[in-house]
Regions:
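Short glycine-centered helix-capping/turn motifs at secondary-structure transition points
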Residues: 31-32, 36-37, 187, 206, ...
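Short, glycine-/small- and polar/acidic-enriched structural segments
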Residues: 4-8, 12-164, 354-355
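Short, solvent-exposed loop/beta-turn-alpha elements that line the ligand-binding surface or hinge
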Residues: 40, 44, 217-223, 294-303
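Secondary-structure end/capping motifs
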Residues: 244-320
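Short, surface-exposed acidic
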Residues: 45-53, 154-161, 245, 276-289, ...
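Conserved C-terminal helix/tail region of periplasmic/extracytoplasmic solute-binding proteins
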Residues: 315-356
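Pocket-lining segment of extracytoplasmic ligand-binding domains
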Residues: 172-272
Length: 356
């Protein structure tokens, strides 16, 4: 390698640090940044290599994303899985919480006699169950069904659930929604749930009857529908955070800017969301309504943490996590207030490769 006189070789001689990032294929701050290359640009001239879990099909990487055992991982995904994985190995730390409000459809076959939510009494409802120790899809659907039934005074004892067997949640491009549709069309289940833009697309393609559509605005404005909110957490590998707090703070600062960017460039944001979910722009627009920038926001306000506590209590009641699990030791939301100061490059990254 030829180096000109006076050139700073400190970064050139440093080995690159691999940092994994992961997000759900819906509206997330990380998705908005990833599609614009903003995360990579933040560290363009530094020995940090950001790699998406989504583009990697190695089983150990996919499993490590799910249980947060993957070193150097920063993850924005469903909160239930994050809580479960923290209870499993205490490997992660919570940086921020996000809320996604999107359309939730109650659907039945076109020939079904179900015309309204009250008609669900005595019916069989589709409920997914992924393989493995923890099923995020089951948590989401069960909370949603309980919430929906409660709006019309029904309980779980008034209906029956039909289990939809699905792949392990770490499987790339798993397709639970299509399996639910198959169960509804075949008569194994009388009704099912479809979520977000992909749900709108699939319901239309399958010719399903929409019994009820809960819009994002209605969900956000009605506390009784809080079980329909997609609660997300931004978490980070704890050893990586301890060794590289300034790096994590910079990543977090980028992620918390996504909502402002979405507000300034709504058309571009909508296009990115459609790309993330592999859906049409019109379906993404209908699914999220006017709440895209609100849904992209991340923070640690009291109301966000209260909603996270409600979810944790729900999981404890169903023995999905240990009763001793506590949010307080998990939190590192103080990183939201850290602003990395410019320092000598050697000092700044001398601990960068501490984490294996």
């Amino acid at each position: 390698m030829t180096v000109r006189p006076g050139t700073d070789t400190s970064t050139a001689t440093m080995p690159s640090q691999l940092v994994w990032y992961a997000r759900c294929p819906t509206l997330t701050a990380m998705g908005l940044l990833a599609n614009r290359g903003a995360l990579q640009r933040e560290f363009l001239r530094e020995p940090i290599n950001l790699v998406s879990v989504r583009e990697n099909s190695t089983p150990s990487v996919r499993q490590g994303y799910l249980d947060h055992s993957l070193p150097n991982l920063i993850r924005e995904g469903d909160a239930a899985t994050a809580l479960w994985s923290y209870g499993l190995n205490q490997r992660s730390r919570l940086l921020a919480v996000g809320h996604t409000w999107h359309t939730v459809l109650v659907v039945a076959s076109g020939r079904s006699g179900i015309g309204r939510l009250n008609d669900l009494k005595g019916r069989t409802l589709a409920l997914p169950r992924e393989a493995g120790a923890f099923s995020p899809a089951r948590v989401r659907s069960l909370r949603a069904w309980e919430t929906i039934l409660d709006t019309v005074g029904l309980r779980a004892s008034d209906i029956e659930f039909h289990n939809i067997v699905a792949d392990h949640p770490s499987t790339p491009f798993g397709d639970i929604a299509r399996r639910e549709i198959e169960a509804v069309l075949s008569g194994q289940a009388d009704a099912g749930l479809l979520f977000g833009a992909k749900g709108l697309e699939l319901a239309r393609a399958a010719g399903l009857k929409v019994i009820h559509s809960f819009t994002p605005e209605v969900i956000r404005n009605d506390p009784a529908l809080s079980g329909l909110v997609e609660l997300r957490t931004l978490t980070v590998d704890y050893p990586f955070l301890e060794a590289n707090e300034a790096v994590v703070a910079r990543l977090l600062r980028q992620l918390t800017s996504a909502a402002d960017w979405a507000a300034q460039f709504p058309k571009e944001a909508l296009n990115h969301i459609a790309l993330e979910g592999k859906v049409e722009v019109a379906d993404a627009a209908q699914a999220y309504g006017p709440l895209i920038n609100a849904g992209a926001a991340l923070g640690a306000e009291d109301w966000r943490l209260r909603d996270l506590q409600v979810l944790l209590d729900w999981l404890k009641l169903r023995h999905a996590v240990d009763d001793s699990l506590n949010l307080t030791p998990w939190q590192r939301t103080d990183v939201l207030n850290i602003f990395a100061q410019p320092t000598d490059i050697k000092e700044k990254y001398k601990r960068l490769n501490v984490v294996a």
